[in-house]
Amino acid sequence: MIIGVGIDVAEIERFGAALERTPQLADRLFVGSELTLPSGERRGIASLAARFAAKEALAKALGAPGGLLWSDAEVWVEESGQPRLRVSGTVAARAAELGVRGWHVSLSHDAGVASAVVIAEG
């Protein structure tokens, strides 16, 4: 059963400018593994913008309650390329309250825009 659906878009250039203006913003929005590639290189702005859009979409799928921490949701990618969500703390508590048992995530970025769709399934 679908419990919630969220969608969000982020303008990549604008998101990158926000990260440049406020260097500590990346540490508030992302956990360490989201910021770097497996090789140790820093992840590109388009990829980070898509991950941010996924977190916004996740909040919407959960009914957009206040009090969710960005660091309590992690977007990671399987070897196959399939994006996944790992939730903890405030996000996991809200998901449990709603009866969420799994997530479906889709990320994309093209033409200067990053987008994400998150489906919460119970």
UniProtKB/Swiss-Prot annotation:
Q: Which reaction does it catalyse?
A: apo-[ACP] + CoA = holo-[ACP] + adenosine 3',5'-bisphosphate + H(+)
| Keyword match NADP | no
Task: Give the protein's cofactors.
Answer: Mg(2+)
Name the Pfam families on file. Answer: ACPS
Q: Which GO terms describe its biological process?
A: fatty acid biosynthetic process
Q: Which residues bind Mg(2+)?
A: 8, 56
* UniProt-listed InterPro entries: 4-PPantetheinyl_Trfase_dom, 4-PPantetheinyl_Trfase_dom_sf, ACPS, Ppantetheine-prot_Trfase_dom
Q: Which family does it belong to?
A: Belongs to the P-Pant transferase superfamily. AcpS family.
Name the record gives this protein: Holo-[acyl-carrier-protein] synthase
